[in-house]
Each structure stands twice: as structure tokens, then as C-alpha cells.
Amino acid sequence: MKQQFTPQEMADRCLIIREVQNIVGKVAHCDMLADYDLVYKNFWSTQEDVCLGFNNGYFKGAAAVKGYYDQKLANAKKLTELVMEKWKDHKDVQGKTAAEMFGAGYVKGTDMHTPIVEVAQDMKSAKALWQFQAADTRVTARGPLSVWKIGYMAADLIEEDGQWKIKNLLYALDIDHPCAEPWTEPSKYGPIPEFAAFDIPEPEPTVPAEVYKAYAPRRPYQEPPRMPEPYTTLAETFSYGI
């Protein structure tokens, strides 16, 4: 039987849906600005069993999730330093401090769409799924490069001390490929010796796993992240984490 809600319950649920979309949107915005120091402390639950997932595995537990954002911030600072060193004679760099130049060599735009949000019947949690398309441009070991990142963001959120916080967050990428090339072919952009210092490694999951397989011409059908569906409590439904 379809769940019936009072006008007040409907209003409360609309506010929760708005909050869920705002929180995950703010996380995406911080990623676009490399403001990684703001993400964990402002938007994640303080519970120990939080989980952050990517195609190649999970960051499981509070320390691992916080460590991911700490490493992303360190990488952004390292990129700034490398850009300042390589182009130290450029007028836009001369006389500037690292703090003033933070974010140099990096720009990202993320478009999130097709939101699906389900609020639990007990109104203590919510599940959400988006598709997204991002253009990630930065100086890399292959030189300055723009990369399409297209896929899904999925999240479990919980109410914690009167505020909504992320418990699990999953990024499932279908496309991770340079913008100027067909997705059906291997990339022709190889390492460039003069940019070798820009080979900055991404954080490695603490629980390696093939969570999701990116598109390739001969990829078998890849089931997308499960769509949120009506549920009673978070304990009684599936999870976007492990």
C-alpha cells in the first residue's frame, strides 16, 4: 500500500530532500575549488564506520575517509608549488605566495543531475543518487590535460545531532578519459619528460576492490549503482558503503 503522509510530514520530507541535495552539492563544490579541508569536518558523520567509495575500492572508517581528504589537500598544495616553480618567471606568478596561488594548475566543473532522493519512513536517514558530468583540467605528467569524468554519485545520509551528515558516499565513474579523444579508443596522451614532476599519485583505497568498471568498448553490461527505493530504516535497506 502506498504510504500516506500528513501535510506536515510532507513538508518535513521536502526540507530533508532539500538539505540532502545541498549537502552533496556542497561536497561537489568543495571538490571543484580544492577546498578539501572543509569536506570531512562539515559534511561527514562523526560515526566510525563511514565509507567513501570509488571504482577501485573503498576508504573504510573515519580515519581513512579523513585521510583521503587530507591527501587530496596535500596534492593540491603540491600542484600549486610545482606550477609556481615551472612558471616562476610568468607575470601571474612573480611576487605571489603559495597561499595566493593555491589552486593554480587546476580547474574543475561538475554538473549534477537526475537526482533521486528517498527519505526513510522513520525520517532518520535518506538515500540519494545522481548522475554527474565533470571536466577536470589540471597540469599532469602528460602535460596540461582536460579529462571527462562522467558517472554516478550515490549517498547515504543520516540525521546526527539535528543535522544531516554523510555516512556513505560512492563515486562510480563510467568515463574517465581525455576530453579531446574518442572514449572508444586508448588515450594517445603519454608522459612528457619535462612534466615528470607532476606525476602526483591519487590516494589509494584502504580496501582495494573492483567496485565499478569504467566504460570500454568490450565492457560487459555494468549495473549502475542501485536506485534508492522506499524504505523504513537505514538498517533494513542496502548500503552504498561496506
Q: What is each residue range found by the language model?
A:
Residues Y36-A134:
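A solvent-exposed, acidic/Ser-Thr-rich amphipathic alpha-helical stretch
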Residues S125-L129, I150-T184:
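Short beta-strand edge/turn micro-motifs at domain boundaries
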Residues A135-V147, I175-H177:
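Short, cysteine-centered beta-strand-loop-beta hairpins and adjacent loop/turn segments enriched
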Residues A28-D31, V39, V117, A155-I158, ...:
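Conserved catalytic-core segments centered on acid/base and nucleophilic motifs
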Residues K26, N55, R142-P144:
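Active-site rim elements
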Residues M1-S45:
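Short, low-complexity N-terminal intrinsically disordered segments enriched in polar/charged residues
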Residues W183-I242:
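A hydrophobic membrane-anchoring alpha-helix module
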Residues T110-M112, V147-M153:
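Short, surface-exposed coil-to-beta transition loops
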